[in-house]
Amino acid sequence: MSQSPKVGFVSLGCPKALVDSEQIITQLRAEGYEISGTYDGADLVVVNTCGFIDEAVQESLDAIGEALTENGKVIVTGCLGAKSSASGSNLIEEVHPKVLAVTGPHAVGEVMQAVHSHLPKPHDPFVDLVPAAGIKLTPRHYAYLKISEGCNHRCTFCIIPSMRGDLVSRPVAEVMLEAENLFKSGVKELLVISQDTSAYGVDVKYRTGFWNGKPIKTRMTDLVAALGELAAQYGAWVRLHYVYPYPSVDEVIPLMAEGPFKGHVLPYLDVPFQHAHPDVLKRMKRPANAEKVLERVQKWREICPDLTIRSTFIAGFPGETEAQFETLLDFIREAELDRVGCFAYSPVEGATANELDGALPDDVREERRARFMEVAEEVSARRMQRKVGKTLKVLIDEVGNEGGIGRTAADAPEIDGVVYVEPAAKASKRYKVGDFVSVKITGADGHDLWGEV
């Protein structure tokens, strides 16, 4: 019996890219290819790239170079595949002319076509061995659910639309079927992702779809309600990411706070505010201003007191004055956002922000980022201390000799904090990866918690 052809895989970038990788690997396995964990054990290598910021571009180019050196046969896909060099040619092909093929992001068909060209698929693949939920690169107890591709916004600092195109929403029945299959496979936490989760359905004018005979609009609020109902059947969590601050977000908060979905649609919002001063937001082509956002945050917390808000910001954007930056710091103090990240503005090739006046020196941008994070960490530490003494539901991610590591409803994997859980004193309280356990919080710092079952 001949050996199945083997494909190595390198996945870089954000959760959206990870989902693309999962879809490609699922198709490879469905067609009978094996996935190799090493370069030398693979017949060829697929590298899924990121091209959002300069550091990501360099990391991707380095990964391609390593794969070429170690294996020699490389197919490249992902956001960097859609990027041109200064001369107008494909950047990857210019830097690494020996790659076999290059595609853009979200291109399963093109990647498979390239694989077939250089490594013909085996006969009679055992397609029934591939689970309905697909191949996942995350641990078995959580998974990402991508509901749309692309973005209709044209933020001046971002080049994602030029790489991934305008918004294309997945049919609601298709999303629900994938969610059900994931829950059936044992997933305890579903992380809803896209470039713009709030815009789900805009491109199809909120068309009504059907799931199990029930009508569901292709709209964020309706989808979240349907996912919450499904999650409740399996005792699972649904977490929302990349929620652009549309007015429609206000409709989701009650689903987190009360009724049958409470505890399943997590009181957690990942909202990329980016800044707080209206003039800076205007230059970014972003909505809102600090006063309106503060009012909304306060209203959200009135409705849902347990709400956790995560956000990202940019310090040192072109034209940002010291006074405008101070407005941002004041906003962070007043809004008391739970989890924040901040980037010192970095020019991205192809972004229209590069044409704006008032570019700031590198040291000023970095100094403002550092000051921002000092304030943010003070706020986070205060909010974390309020959890000491409470008993919280924790999803266990790891178990070792010294206890477990898990996350509360306030913590998304990889980007937020964790809970360090003491070893169970009694056999009846022992836990394993993927279990939900009640943990009494005994300590906290600015990021993480400590507790006991």
Swiss-Prot record:
Gene3D superfamilies the record matches: Methylthiotransferase, N-terminal domain (3.40.50.12160), Nucleic acid-binding proteins (2.40.50.140), tm_1862 like domain (3.80.30.20)
Superkingdom, natural source: Bacteria
All copies of domain Radical SAM core, residue ranges: 137-382
Keyword Ion transport applies: no
Binding, [4Fe-4S] cluster 1: C14, C50, C79
Protein family (similarity comment): Belongs to the methylthiotransferase family. RimO subfamily.
GO biological process: tRNA modification
Cofactors demanded by this protein: [4Fe-4S] cluster
Chief location of this protein within or outside the cell: cytoplasm
One GO MF term attached to the UniProt entry: metal ion binding
NCBIfam families: 30S ribosomal protein S12 methylthiotransferase RimO, MiaB/RimO family radical SAM methylthiotransferase
Binding residues for [4Fe-4S] cluster 2: C151, C155, C158
Compartments it resides in: Cytoplasm
Function, as annotated: Catalyzes the methylthiolation of an aspartic acid residue of ribosomal protein uS12.
Pfam family for this entry, one: UPF0004
Domain TRAM, chain residue ranges per copy: 385-453
Name of the protein described by the UniProt record: Ribosomal protein uS12 methylthiotransferase RimO
Enzyme class, UniProt record, top EC level: transferase
